[in-house]
């Protein structure tokens, strides 16, 4: 059997079938042609109406857009007006400073152009184009430039000639010094060898007081075991100062150093001079000197009295600087005060380094000093022919130089008579010698000859000291720097150490006596310590990369390339007698280097601080000017190099200090937490009868508050333990007594914890908020409480009666007799009711306080 499925396909326009609620289909309605035409017309009309509505909507939208744009324009105009009004209300000083800064920058650019270009035709201020010059003007301008350059070249040539003359003068002077040193070395070595055999006999036979100075080549003045060094050699003895072969230095008794015109050459006391002593009798204590012992008198103040010392150790550093150590300072505090140093010459004339006693030496021309020195040299008993003044000057054919020289010679001839009268005055000769050596050293430093020449001299003297290292002095101090000038270069600072009578003391003032120690200097007068050892060597300290300004405890140091400036402050520290007594038992043999021993507990006064800051600002300005002159181009295009680098304390190159950053960060954190916590504490003060007290904390980034209740608002029998609130950066701690503690970072949790502490105290001690003078307590709550109390009083009281026969109950209320001993008032229910209501009021009050803190 075949299975088929037939599917009927409906026509394209099937009739609309209508059915009723039962699903029965209505017969289809056939539409006539006229009705169909009317239906089509209605559809077309409806379509037109829809299009018209769309057009109207579009027009309305366009109108609305135009209105919105106009409104936006009006709002924009109002905004611009408001902005203009706000700009007009801005402080005019801001724009003034901006214009001022722009003007300053433009002025610096103009200064740079003027300084760097120097040609007016290349500076165009008003326009980019420039009218060409006429040929005649160009010719005149070129001619003017050529003449100006020729004049500049002539000036440079004249300066070079003058500089060459001075350099030749300096070189000749230095060579003269060197020749004298060589002659002295040769003479002392030969004479030491010749007199070796005679030394013991002479030393044993000589005794008595000091004798007079000997002549050239002969036996000098005889002291206690001391003989002049003219022809026999130095003998260490009682200190008779003999004539030194015409050079007049004299023996330093007990030390063995022979001062030759201020240069400590060293006596022949070792293998050559040891046999000279014999049993002639050396005074006790004189054999303690060694090659590094320096005769210098210094002292310090202790309990108002001045204590003198005489020993100082001399040593040389790796860079050639001199270190002078004072071993007998009893305590470190004595360095805080000025260490007074008294330099003595061989005639016991003392020169103090006190600032009040320092006087500026008169400026005398170099030729005058040279001739005066030569004149005094002629008066001394010198074996060698003295050097004439002309030997230190180069031969030149310059007429101007000859005229100047003739004028100086005429002036010298007029002054020589006055000088001859005072030629035997040791103080005058010593002063002239100091000036002469200072002038020569300044010339050497000016042309930077000092390091090379004096380094050779130091090596030669060191060889002398090593060859005769047994009991001879290493040399005098290199120089004393007083107020910036080198005074007394090469001077012997020994003095009369040994006893006995002194003999003739002659002086050598020739400028050809060299300085055997150049690098180390004393800085006397301006320093806070009184004697700071400073190495003034431009070739060693050259640093042109940056400027360093160092503020130490005692002074300000400025290093700007080869420009080194030291400014000291004399601090006045109050002396503690207890500390002095405790420190007197310290080891007196400890070497105290003045270079590094500065007190770390110096407290400057406001006046001293202001003075230091004023000096620092002044120097900063000067260094800025130096930088501006030195590198205009670099300063103009690299603004970070305008200000010098400032380093306080020590010389380091660290961009940021971690300790400072950490401290600033901790302080900022603490301030943030402090402000948040203080808002909560203000709410407590406003709503509760508390007393808030702030106490200083141990650290900088911490605070401590103590919160207590006012006495009138608490139970005096059981007072509340104070609440301590400590803030350390962003950490908050609350402590009450020994058992209650809290630690968190949130101030709201902090407030809730403190409220719980206060609430528990109020509940435990039965304190109602109405009893406190609290602003936050509601008066309606108090009225409700009064109504509750009245209702309690109006309730009939219930009593317990006992079966005691003595009790009588009567119906009449007026005649009731109650035995109070047997009737108890049943008040437990009433007390519990009042207490529960009071607790409810306390809970309600503190709940409102917590809400206020949460919504702060």
Swiss-Prot record:
Coiled-coil intervals: 41-91
Region: Disordered, residue numbers: 55-79, 371-424
InterPro entries named in the record: Mediator_Med17
A single GO cellular-component term on record: membrane
GO molecular function, one term: transcription coregulator activity
Superkingdom of origin organism: Eukaryota
Annotated keywords: Activator, Coiled coil, Membrane, Nucleus, Transcription, Transcription regulation, Transmembrane, Transmembrane helix
Subcellular location: Membrane; Nucleus
GO BP of this protein: regulation of transcription by RNA polymerase II
Bias (Low complexity): 371-399, 406-420
TM spans (from-to): 217-237, 251-271
Basic and acidic residues bias spans: 67-79
Record membrane topology: Multi-pass membrane protein
Family the UniProt entry places it in: Belongs to the Mediator complex subunit 17 family.
Protein task: Component of the Mediator complex, a coactivator involved in the regulated transcription of nearly all RNA polymerase II-dependent genes. Mediator functions as a bridge to convey information from gene-specific regulatory proteins to the basal RNA polymerase II transcription machinery. Mediator is recruited to promoters by direct interactions with regulatory proteins and serves as a scaffold for the assembly of a functional preinitiation complex with RNA polymerase II and the general transcription factors.
Subunit structure: Component of the Mediator complex.
UniProt protein name: Putative mediator of RNA polymerase II transcription subunit 17
